[in-house]
A protein has these predicted regions:
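C-terminal beta-strand-loop-alpha-helix "lid" module of Rossmann-like NAD(P)-dependent dehydrogenases
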Residues: 1-289
Length: 289
């Protein structure tokens, strides 16, 4: 049976832990909001790219481009996007588990995030390069990753490039996904589904475009930027997912600590009350004697 001193020591220790997890929860919540805001700021540019692509396609005939070339897949590259840190529940393990489905003999990995790089090194899989990205992913970080993947594809070192990452749905839901990257199929976006377009934003669909010198020239230029924008949206989704999962994980830890503290306080008070009652009975018995 625990002594009052042991219980006080445990209560003090768990209280300190609860204060730490609460602080980490608040930090993660702040970073999550920033990641979502970054996605909102980038969204109009993404929408414009997709609208221009759709319009340019209607003005072109049989348009061919190396980034659109579909080849028999003998070797592939996978851009594996993970978190930099842990304490975010099953988020990392869910993404890394999907990476194990690829044949290690024919797959080379490009990693983004420390946990992804550590996993590839630990499992001794082929690694083309590893990248890092901050709490607020930048376009330059996305461009570096997209550039390497594009070069591998254009040099015929790989026949296909896919992405394994986490799609942010909401604070409680993050879904590990496998996305097609190269060759480029239908151009589309990875918008955060929890955010809505601002009514003040101009609609790209209502805009008339004039292509100079030609739709084909514009499309060739557009495809390169599309790859960068797509990776940027993937990174923003991954970071929002990481911070959301960490916030929920820390909130659960804080709630569990609070419940444990409550139970220990109850046990401590019962033990203390029992000791007081015992002492009073001993005193009363002594006087009676």
């Amino acid at each position: 049976m625990n002594s009052p001193r042991d219980l006080r020591r445990r209560i003090k220790s768990i209280t300190s832990t609860a204060q730490l997890t609460k602080a980490m929860e608040m930090v993660a919540a702040s970073k999550m909001r920033k990641a979502q805001e970054a996605a909102i700021v980038a969204r109009p540019f993404g929408r414009l790219v997709y609208a221009i692509q759709r319009e340019a396609t209607t003005h072109m005939g049989d348009f061919k481009h190396p980034l659109l070339e579909v080849r028999e897949v003998r070797k592939r590259a996978v851009i594996l996007v993970g978190a930099d840190k842990g304490l975010c529940g099953p988020l990392n393990s869910n993404v890394l588990r999907m990476a194990t489905k690829f044949d290690p003999k024919t797959t080379t990995f490009i990693t983004a995030g420390r946990r992804a790089a550590q996993f590839i090194a630990r499992t001794q899989r082929q690694l083309a390069a590893e990248f890092s990205y901050g709490d607020s992913p930048t376009y330059a970080e996305a461009r570096a990753i997209a550039g390497l993947a594009r070069d591998l594809f254009l040099k015929n070192e790989v026949d296909q490039v896919q992405i394994v990452a986490t799609r942010f749905v909401n604070t409680l839901t993050q879904i590990p996904v496998t996305l097609e990257f190269l060759p480029i199929g239908e151009i589309h976006g990875l918008e955060l589904p929890t955010t809505k377009p601002s009514t003040s934003e101009p609609s790209a669909d209502d805009t008339e475009f004039a292509f100079e010198p030609s739709p084909e020239f514009v499309m060739s230029y557009l495809l390169l930027h599309y790859l960068n924008i797509y990776i940027y949206e993937v990174l923003v989704n991954a970071k929002a997912s990481e911070q959301s999962a960490r916030m929920v994980s820390m909130k659960n830890a804080t709630d569990n600590a609070d419940k444990l503290i409550k139970d220990l306080n109850l046990e401590y008070n019962k033990l203390r009350q029992g000791n007081i009652t015992k002492e009073m009975l001993e005193i009363a018995g002594g006087k009676a004697g």
